Design a protein with these regions (language model features):
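N-terminal secretory signal peptides that target proteins for export/translocation
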Residues: 1-6
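Active-site SXXK
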Residues: 73-87
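Mature N-terminal segment immediately following signal peptide/propeptide cleavage
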Residues: 28-60
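An aromatic/glycine/proline-enriched structural segment found at the starts
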Residues: 27, 180, 188, 213, ...
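Sec/Tat signal peptide C-region and signal peptidase I cleavage site
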Residues: 22-26
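M16 family metallopeptidases and their MPP-like homologs
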Residues: 51-68, 74-78, 92-137, 169-193, ...
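Bacterial N-terminal signal peptides
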Residues: 10-21
Length: 442
């Protein structure tokens, strides 16, 4: 059986088992173990007991675009790029070379609330991975020459993914419009004006403040024991000292007091696009699980309401999706759509709102909700087979400060009722307090 066939069989088996036994299942999460070093660095280990000989080592820093200030946006993302340059022990590019020479893979990502770096490799390379991450934490050189070259790379990334991409540009601008005061006002890539005006001293200061042990969480998942990880973590990170007080984010977005609407025009744009956002609570709120179920009803798969009605039947959109963002601070439920070439943008917007009204009015069947529960649970359980997914799952919650929503997720999903769905839709999908951004084709 091929690997692809094996994965398909595994996923199909999970769904079949859930249908046979009923939607409700016990908590599927593997047990995890934690320890905090004397310098405040948190260690999280998730043994998977799968005899794979593979682990994912993922280091999270509690810093993202949320920790930036206006005029200095995008620095967390820029620092992520520079972290693979030279250190006291490594030449530029040597980090990647070492990982690949051991048959491993590595990558990094910056979000609103986090920056993280991971290495997936053989379990025997745990010490090597920790040694590399230790270098990144306290020995980056951050030379001006490396900075200037990488700034050009980041600026080009901004042009490619945001400025010259209709959906990317709309995504950036809807956050600019929805959030007026909170740092979620911009995306992790930052404003182009800021990218071009950074100084290397800005990046060095950002690094010194946020890349410290008491602002980091090390997550190791896979074929490994907690004892091994705790011992090696002490060896490679226990001696690193905290040198600066980490600034706290105090910004609170004012309560929305009305609807916002912006119509944008971009000379190079060749397609009408639309974004609608609604304010929702942060990741810890019980309603997040219900909002996630609503997002699946609206836009998960070919039988979802947006896909079936707006894309296939009425052919109003080439693509349309909606999802709840689980952020450290209150965030948004985001809907984005790309209009079909010969369709009316006004009609598309009205039809999107009509679909939301249906959910508010209780037009969701028990069979529809059960299908969402089964598929969501199956996807969740299937993701637990990968050390990458497991490390990312635990890391994403620990870095935001609370693992409890993850531990309670399956139980809360099982308990969702049709009334919960309609109540949440009524509570949050109030168009009198929404943000709508339209990007018109030229």
């Amino acid at each position: 059986m091929s690997l692809k066939s094996l994965k398909l069989f595994s996923y199909t088996f999970i769904i079949g088992l859930m249908i046979t036994t009923g939607v409700s299942m016990a908590n599927s999460l593997p047990e995890h173990f934690t320890k905090t070093l004397d310098n405040g660095m948190q260690i999280v280990v998730i043994p998977m007991d799968n005899n794979s000989g593979v682990i994912t080592t993922d280091i999270y820093y509690k810093v993202g675009s949320r920790n930036e200030v206006m005029g200095k946006s995008g620095m967390a993302h820029m620092l992520e790029h520079l972290s693979f340059k030279s250190t006291d022990k490594l030449e530029e590019g040597e980090f990647d070379t070492i990982v690949k020479s051991r048959g491993g893979v590595n990558n990094a990502a910056t979000g609103f609330d986090k920056t993280h770096y991971y290495i997936k490799t053989a379990s025997k390379n745990l010490g090597l991975s920790l040694d590399l991450f230790s270098e990144l934490m306290h020995n980056l050189k951050l030379t001006d020459e490396e900075f200037q070259k990488e700034r050009d790379v980041v600026a080009e990334e901004r042009r490619l993914r945001t400025d010259n991409n209709p959906m990317g540009y709309l995504y950036f601008r809807v956050f600019n419009t929805h959030f007026t005061y909170h740092p979620y006002h911009w995306l992790p890539i930052g404003f182009m004006q800021d990218i071009l005006s950074w100084k290397i001293e800005d990046i060095r200061d950002f690094y010194q403040r946020y890349y410290q042990p008491n602002n980091a969480i090390l997550v190791v998942a896979g074929d490994i024991t907690p004892e091994e990880v705790f011992k090696e973590s002490e060896k490679y990170f226990g001696h690193i000292q905290n040198k600066h007080t980490i600034p706290k984010v105090t910004a609170v977005e004012p309560k929305v007091d009305g609807a916002k609407r912006a119509v944008l025009h971009k000379e190079s744009n060749q397609v009408d696009t639309l974004a609608i956002t609604y304010s929702i609570p942060n990741y810890e709120h019980d309603d997040q699980v219900v909002l996630s179920a609503i997002s699946h009803i609206l836009s998960s798969g070919k039988s979802s309401r947006f896909e079936k009605t707006l894309v296939n039947e009425k052919q109003l959109a080439n693509q349309v999706y909606g999802y709840n963002m689980e952020l450290a601070d209150p965030g948004v439920f985001l809907i984005m759509a790309m209009c079909s070439p010969h369709a009316s943008l006004d009609t598309l917007e009205k039809e999107i709102l009509a679909e939301l009204e249906k959910i508010k009015n209780g037009d969701v069947t028990q069979a529809e909700l059960d299908k969402v529960k089964i598929n969501t649970k199956a996807e969740f359980i299937y993701s637990l087979e990968s050390s990458n997914s497991v490390a990312g799952l635990y890391g994403d919650y620990y870095v935001k400060g609370n693992i409890q929503p993850l531990l309670e997720y399956e139980e809360k999903l099982d308990k969702i009722t049709l009334k919960d769905i309609s109540d949440a839709a009524k509570k949050y999908f109030d168009h009198n307090f929404s943000t709508t951004v339209i990007l018109k084709k030229n």
